[in-house]
């Protein structure tokens, strides 16, 4: 039974990831006044499967100067972590109901840095190494604000459990009282997933493709799959934390429908930002975090800690 549950979680994620790639290419096409993929299958719907077939049947070339063990391990680790992050998410019931679900997500997403670092270093290429170092600095930096924003929201729910967060928002979405935090969270998730305007790691004009430049065929596809799964996961987490839907025990399907709709709308916002915004300069990226986001999130954390004390109560406890 646990194996069936695992497959029922993984297969829809893989399908969603495949069609997210197609949707992105279609949106990019229409925004640039062209069609996008429209040859394979009706309206190009089978394009992701054709791409997968092509990539996984090609020979995975390895640079002769690369460190083979890490070079092969890195993409596998990236995909494993991307799938592992989904286990505590309530949709409406999580695969594993962890008491410290949010802490687990934060800790596991930090491990994704290693796959990027290994791939950049093991490729033995200057472009890959510079891309990897940028990605690591960016990811570690933005995780600081993500953690502080999470702490602020947890002070309102009183638990690290994601299901409790959903219960907290039965009467009011957390995005309304904490909209500055929600805005900073959304921008930080863009940086965390290395998306435009923070895709410095894959700056085509500077680094060709970034940390995955030496990868081809299957391993290259694994990196792409991990990236798009992380995008969907981050938006799903955003929907859970700030746009929690009321869970009705009589109709769990309704919860799932609302929940997925919110996650899809947030994901489409990611794609729209990709088409509309130019890339940040690296110093601007770090300036935004350390000089703007960090002081603001720390100030808001102090506010959410002091408020219950000021009104002679304690934070909610569950």
UniProtKB/Swiss-Prot annotation:
Q: Which family does it belong to?
A: Belongs to the complex I subunit 1 family.
Q: Name one GO cellular component term.
A: respiratory chain complex I
Q: Which Pfam families match?
A: NADHdh (PF00146)
The protein's name in its UniProt record: NADH-ubiquinone oxidoreductase chain 1
Source superkingdom: Eukaryota
The principal localisation class reads: mitochondrion
Q: How does it sit in the membrane?
A: Multi-pass membrane protein
This chain's function reads: Core subunit of the mitochondrial membrane respiratory chain NADH dehydrogenase (Complex I) which catalyzes electron transfer from NADH through the respiratory chain, using ubiquinone as an electron acceptor. Essential for the catalytic activity and assembly of complex I.
Report the catalytic activity.
Answer: a ubiquinone + NADH + 5 H(+)(in) = a ubiquinol + NAD(+) + 4 H(+)(out)
Q: Which residues form a coiled coil?
A: none
Q: Gene name on record?
A: MT-ND1
GO biological process: any one?
A: mitochondrial electron transport, NADH to ubiquinone
Alphabetized UniProt keyword annotations: Electron transport, Membrane, Mitochondrion, Mitochondrion inner membrane, NAD, Respiratory chain, Translocase, Transmembrane, Transmembrane helix, Transport, Ubiquinone
**Matching PROSITE patterns:** COMPLEX1_ND1_1, COMPLEX1_ND1_2
What is the organism field in this record? Answer: Pan troglodytes
